[in-house]
Amino acid sequence: MEDSNAAYTAYQSGDVLFIKDVPTQEIPSLQGNPEFHVEPNLGTYYLSMNLEDPAFADVNVRKALSLAIDRDYVANTLMQGTYSPAYNLVGEGWVDTDGSSFNANANGGQSYISEDFDANLEEAKQLLADAGYPNGEGLPTITYTTNDAGYHKVVAEYLQQAWGELGINVEVNIVEWSSFTPMRRNGEYMVARNGWVGDYSDPSNMLDLFCTGNGNNDGKFSNADFDAAMEKAASTMDTAERSAALHQAEDVLMEQVGCIPVAYYNDFWLQSEKITGIWHSAYGFWYFMYGDIAE
């Protein structure tokens, strides 16, 4: 069923026993329900900035936009806990070369972005002033482009308010999905919603997106140090060197704000307790080959 409300109605009536598209307005009433499942997904919800636009030429502007976002509020209030706050690009579940958590090892074990939002907001205001735009004065209106599915519209409205706290005027441009992806790919935007779900758990699968010339590099991020680190990671046979190179690449990406991580994906779904033997993977798939339905 393409209509999540119709699917939910069918689930409630017992016509179906499993739905993966739960209407977001129903989530508050489902908290604590054993049939409502939320599990991590190897993916990150992030913002792409069109780095060919002069408005984003100064890294301090990009940092200010990132710091002005209260990620905990976005993930746990706007997204109702169905996402997790993202303080770096590569989230939980991605595996370092020694089998440990790449996320836990990032930046010496410290978050790239402080979880102290009040301090972040003050720093954002100062960075914007340092870039020559005190209280947002002189910075052109930012157009934020997204499609209208799930939480995308409420996130857009939040960003309009959050960046407004910096004195930045933001216009929200909501387009149909069929138009959205080509617009983003062709650079027909200023800031746009983006995201990636991993094909496999090696962090290069996420970081490769930002290599110069990558077809999925919608923001056109290009940095020689980043590219060199990714090339080192791809060519070395030494696992410790490869790990160091991948972490160096993420360090550069985060320092240069090649994108703005917002939240880590989780999958959420409704599954009747009558269903047994199926499982969910962090790649966003459900496996039903050993499933059964108890009568």
Language model feature labels by segment:
Residues 269-295:
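Long beta-strand-rich cores associated with HINT superfamily self-processing modules
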